[in-house]
Amino acid sequence: MDHITMEEKINKKTKHIFSNNYDNILSDKQVQCIYKEFFNNNKDNNNNKRFNENGNQINQIDFNSNKEEEKEEKEEKEKEEDEDNITILDDVYYSLEYDFEDYIKYSKILTEKIEKERITQLFEQEKQNRLIRYHQRIQQQKVIKEQLNVNMELLEKRKLLETELSLKSNQLNQCQTQLQQFQSTMTLLQSQHQQTINKLKQTQSEQLQKRRNQQHQNLLKKQKIQKEKEEREQKEKEQKEKEQKEKEEQQQQLFLLQQQQQQEEESKTTNKKKRNSRTTSINRVFRSLLTDVKVPAKKFNGLKSEAQEEMYDQLDTVLNQLKDYSDHSFPFLTKVRPSEAPNYYEIIKKPMDLSLMTKKLKKLEYQSKFEFQLDLNLIFTNCRIYNTDPSGKVYVEHANKMEKKSKDLMKNVKDLDFSMDILKDIVDENKNNNNSNNSVDNNNSLKKGRTSTPNKKQKTSNSTTTTTTTTTTTTATTPNLLNTPLSSPPYTPCSPSTISTVSSTPTTPQSADCPLSPFQQQQQQQTQAQQQPTSNSPRNTTTTTTTITSPISPRETNKDVIMEEEEESSSSSLSSSSLALNSQNENGVNKSIEDSTGVKMESEESTNVKKEENQSGDCENQTTTTTTKEEGEEQQEQEDEEQQQQQQQQEEQTLEIENEEDIINNFNSEIESLNNDFSEKTLQLSIQIKEISEKTEHFKINNSKIQQNLDELPLADKLNLDINNAKELVDDNIELDDSEIIIPPYLNNNNNNCNNNNNNNDNNNNNNIDNDNDNNNNNSLENSFEIEKSKKINKFKELTKENRVRKLKYFLDQQSLPFNKREAFIRTPYFMNTFYNLDLQQQNQKQQQIFNQEINDNDDDNNNNNNNNNNNNNNNNNNNNNNNKPKVMSAIQKMDQDFMDLKVGFFPELTHLSNSIPIITPNYPITCKNSSIDNSVTTPSKSLLRLLNSSKSNNNSNNKKEKQCNYNREGEDDEGRGEEQKEKEEEKEDEDFPNIITNDIAYILLSKSIAKSIESESCLHGTTQETMLIFTDIVSSFIGKIGKLFNKYYSNNGLPNNKSTTTQTTPTTQLQPPPPPPSLSLPPSLLLNSIVTDIFGDSLGILLLKDYMIKKSKNQQIYDDPLFELEVEFENDHLQSDNILQNNNGDIDINESMEIDILGEDDIIDIDDTGLFGHYPRYIEEPAEITLFIDPKPIQKPTTNTTTNNNNNNNNNNNNNNNNNNNNNNNNNNNNNNNNNNNNNNNNNNSNSNNNNNNNNSNSNNNNNNNNNNNNNNNNNNNNNNNNNNNNNNNNNNSINNNNHNNNNNNNNNINNNNNNNNNNNNNNNNNNNINNNNNNNINNNNNNINNYNNNYNNNNNNNNNNNNNNNNNNNNNNNNNYPKPIQASTQTGNLGIQQQLQQQQLHQLQQQQQLQQQYQIQQQQLHLQQQQQQQQQLKLQQIQFQQMQQQQQQQQLQQQTRQPSQPQTPQMQSQPQTPQILSQPQQQLQQLQQQQLQQQQQLQQQQLQQQQLFQQQQQQQQQQQQQQQQQQQQQQQQQQLLHPQQMQIQQNLQQPLQQIQQQQQIQQQQQQQLQQQQQQQQQQQQQQQQQQQQQQQQQQQQQHHQQLQQLQPQQQQQLQQLQPQQLQQLQQLQQLQQLQQLQQLQPQQLQQLQQLQQLQPQQLQQPQQLQPQQLQQQQLQQQQQPQQQQQQPQQQPQQQPQQQQQPQYQTTFQSIASPKEKDKEREKEKEREREKEKDRKFKKVKKTESKKESKKSLNDSSNSDINTSVEQHSPLSPQPISSSKPTPPPVSSKQPQTTQSNTTTTQDSIPPIEQKKKRGRPQKKQ
């Protein structure tokens, strides 16, 4: 069911009426009819609700509709959904705030009720408070106990943690000591091990040396024996040769017999061959069978056991699976490239990847699972170390996943270790090889040779070599593998040894790189000599042996390497040949050499084959040769013998080698044993060290954690203190207070004052009787009060009908706004201070009036007098409140003010919307909170007080204008009387008392608050509207404090910027009001929008704020007021912004902007819907208390009823004697003030003549006079106090108030009366100063005389006015004595004394009122006459001044025409800033002045640059001249060498004087340069000084200009705007002429410099002219004609100059004003001048060429002799070198063409012809 209220239905029916026709608003009767219809239709509905608020009854009925009604309502809702939902405020009659009479009666009734209610409430409150306190104490005890327990627990925890920390710290120290001990033992073991090894090596080297010495001796013996054998053999050979010859003879004889036998034997030989062929074929079959046998291939060859093969297969599968894990394995497959990661190999010293692990696995380098796992872990650790950046987290994740998978795969691999087994095998094989070599027979040793079984580590390496040796072979010793530790990585293989081919000649040993000893060299020579005879024998049997060289580990010591090289060299020297062959398969792949049996088989087969071949060869030799069996036997015997000898030698050598090998093997075995022992010990120590280090780290981590926990806990001392304090606070005995409740009575100020009277008991009795009577009459008063209420309500309805209709219309218009929160446009009372500015005076008036009324109720005799006093008091209160009205207010405020003016009542409920307050604040206000208002108003910030005090100190005279205007309304007859006079007086008061706020205060307050708020939140970005939106968030906290100061003088709505709407309605005949003082000015219409944007709205302002915050963050100083720092930075910006403004410097006067508009019934001015930001931002939702937006609805100007009634006779507590004294004293004061005013006026006249000294004197006079006034007032008040004898306390209070009010009133009257005169005189002087800055002193004196005359006349009028005003002031002295102290003092004397005083005062007041009314009418008539006279005088003065201006301008024009400036027109160099002639646009003129200043600075800079360029050019020319001179000297020296010695002497004699002249010229040039530099420096200094002076003058002039602008009146604006355009043109001419004069002052300085340079030139050139007079006579005769022709040309040019100078100078000044026709004529003239100049130039060139030709001819004629020719070629007097050496004068600027020409003519006459020719060379070309 839809729950619909009665108000909604009313709105539905009235919606169309209000939405379409706002004028057809319902009346009261129509509203009542609508209510009745709903009551009749809904009788059944009993859900009516009523509520009362202050006497008004509003009936709101909620009813449940029937089904039929629901359908109708639904249909209506559907229709109305399309339309806008508009909520209408009900036309409800609010409760009245009672009048003053009713309030006094009703207050007595309410006091008792309120006291009873208060007592009951307080009684219950105290009970509740006691219960609350009881429970609070219990809760506090619980909290204290809980805290105590917590602190106890924390202490226990702290003690436990400290004990743990001490124990673990001891353990950690123990572990550290153990570590140090183990480390020391490690170092000792290492040192001992190294010492033992060194000793063994020394013993081994000694044994080897002894053994070698023995071998050397044996060799010497053998050599002797061999020599003897050789001799024997030679002899035997000789015998054999003889025998052979004999045999040959015999053989020839038997040759024939042999042929026969051969045929027989041929058959035998064929059979033998067949047998031999079969044997060879059988051998081949065996070979083929051996090759066909193929062993099954294995992945890893060289492994000894099957367990090792299984381990390698498992590791291979792990690697393959990791590689196949492609999602995460791709970064670890290959090496890292340096291009991808350049710093990788600098950070990671041991790189590893999967490809490198596969290589190591193929090389059989992994001997355990642990080594393989280390390499895998190394890959992942390298990845984590390098990829520490966040960009490398991806690779770390890949590494983590690969590590997980590797752990899963490695679980399947068996944990085996084969490192120790390999070492044992190596040792056993070495021993077996030694034993087998000793047991082998001699024959087997020749055929098979010795073989050394390879080591396991040798097999793992890919580099294996096979060597074939001829008779003897040497086995390489195994490396010292045991020296290396087990934990080291596997050995890397060394490069394979070079392979040597088999040859009959002996080969060099393999170790060719190592050097041979002399003993070894002898052995090699012997072996070569022995092998030569044997090499020829055909039956040299060769034995092939395979020797496998073991790889050398990189970690072997250098000593082991040296020992092996020595052994190899010794073995190679003894062996005849040791060659190696690589056994290869058919495919070319190296076969493995693991099985020693296979090698032996091949070697045996090779030996058998060679034997068979030798046998076949022998058989063939036997057939060919015819030797006998005997010879063959002999040869065999010889061979056998040789073989036996060789075998013996070999056996000896083998024995020697074996002995050496035994020594080495023994040494190696000892070292191995030592290494094993050392390794075992070190392993144990390393394990122990690791365990201890882990323990230490564990202890450290635990200690750190414990320490953190201790740090988090509070200290033990604090805990103990807290525990002790808590124990003291604990109390178990807590009980309720059962004592009696005593409530003190509510005591008003009246009761307190009465109780304080101890002397007068009668008065207390009377008060008690009165209170009893009041209690009895309460019931009767209540009944009468309700009857009167109905009458007043009817009056209220009739009077407020129009106002209520207006208010409804306004709210309906406001409801049409497009946003939800309409209250955002209305400011709350908390932030508005327009009507809440209730001073203490008003509050005290109210209290005193109530007190007087209560006294009058008690006294029956004085009722009539009391009624009169009450009427007067009410009238005075109303008039005082009218003074508090703002001149500008919002629409709602005006509506409420209209209600208040009707004197019917007030709506307290509307204060939230209307920002207004009742006349008399009730004891219990409904909506207004005085606490919030008082706190905000009475406690301003210190910075604001400083600023306000500073502004008051500067404007003491203007801030004391608070005038008290009291309005009297005694009936409709009084209101109609004198309305026209009142309006005129109001206009005058508005002129005298403008509502003004200083613009400086507004800027300072806003800039301070914003700067402080930005310190906390610096969020400013952007410009214009966006910045303002951000300021709303920042400045919201600041509006509540500072907005109250502005809202005293302004309303919600801003002032209209467009003056066209207001100025149209003002009458033309009415004179404009006088201007405000120069020091005060209004802020603009919208405060935040205008001020904040001017300061910080631009982007530059925001940047400056940011810079300010950055600077402040760097600086450590803290300032209370940051504005004083910002003012320095923003000073230039404010000046520019002020200059840009056009009209009034951003200041607006209320009287000009808001004038009374006669618009008919509704005096409304429509303004555009623009707030601070131009629109309502929809994303901002403000609360109702804070509002930055302005009500867009129309503004209504209130009618200003500011009539000046100077009759305030309410509270004159002084006697007649006191008043008479005051009259006399005030008359004296007025006389003093008049004298002061005369001084002020005279001083102002002098100040306008720009005399600073006079201004200072005038200020001093003003201050002294003001002090005199104050002193006089104080004396007068003291006299008043002496006359008062009855009431001491009252007189003391009155004396204080009189001191203040007399001073204020006297000063205000004197100042206000003299404002018009001073301002008028100042304005007249400003006209003279602004327009006639160049006038004579005589005119100023005349003006001053006129002004003095006016001042005297005005002062006479002021005296009369002051005398009249003093009478008013005497009556007004005691109007404001409303403090509560007099009430307290009167209670001491009793009620009777107070009543007598009041009666006397009332009688005295009635008499004074009649007198004052008569005086007031007379004063008004006098004022009107004075104003008329003043206006007439001002008009006359203006006419006189205008005529004087015209005369002065004519005189100046005549003077300017007579002047003939020597210089042509130049651009404006400098212009004195003058006061603006067109005052409607002062800011444009300021901009022009700034532009002129910039132009001046630019021109000065250009001049400086030109001077610098000239100086540089001169320097360059001098350098060129010096270079040319050097070249000439070199040429002269070369020619002198060729000339005859006699000629040389002649030339030297001639050149000596010339050289002297050149030296003198150089000295003079240097001096000139120095002078020029000094002059330039001086000029620069002068220019800088001038610039500084100009800047200072400009600043002073700008300040004066601002002051003058502020002092100008709107009347001057109109007058000057009406001036003719011709006069304005003349004023512009004056400015331009002054600029030309300044330029003329600058040019003579430049001309003097040029003349000095030109005077120096002829002096330099006269010296060489005197030396050669004979040679130059002919040249002078020829060139005399040229200067005459040149003199004619400059004569033509000066004739043109005066023509140009005679032209009127107005051409320069009136260029901007001249017509276009005149401009065209000037252009044509300029073109003609340029054409003439070009013709002159051509004519000069022709003459130059002719003069050059003639000079050449003359020189050729003069050079007759060879000597003279040589001298002329080399002499510096020739024209070319002189022209180069001569410094050219500085080029004249284009701005001064005429002056340079005139100067050149004068110099050419004095210069001789040759010098003139030299000058014409280069400078004329530059022209």
From Swiss-Prot:
Residues 251-262, 432-486, 494-511, 520-555, 570-579, 753-779, 863-884, 949-958, 1055-1071, 1205-1378, 1679-1705, 1756-1767, 1789-1806 have a biased composition (Low complexity). InterPro entries: Bromodomain, Bromodomain-like_sf, Spt7. Residues 44-83, 200-281, 429-654, 753-781, 855-886, 949-993, 1055-1079, 1190-1386, 1453-1477, 1679-1823 are annotated as: Disordered. Residues 65-77, 225-250, 601-614, 1716-1737, 1744-1755 have a biased composition (Basic and acidic residues). Keywords: Bromodomain. Residues 580-590 have a biased composition (Polar residues). GO terms for cellular component: SAGA complex; SLIK (SAGA-like) complex. GO terms for biological process: regulation of transcription by RNA polymerase II. Residues 631-643 have a biased composition (Acidic residues). One of its GO terms (molecular function) is structural molecule activity. Residues 210-224, 1813-1823 have a biased composition (Basic residues). The keyword tRNA-binding does not apply. Residues 306-413 form the Bromo domain. This is Bromodomain-containing protein DDB_G0280777. The lineage of its organism: Eukaryota, Amoebozoa, Evosea, Eumycetozoa, Dictyostelia.
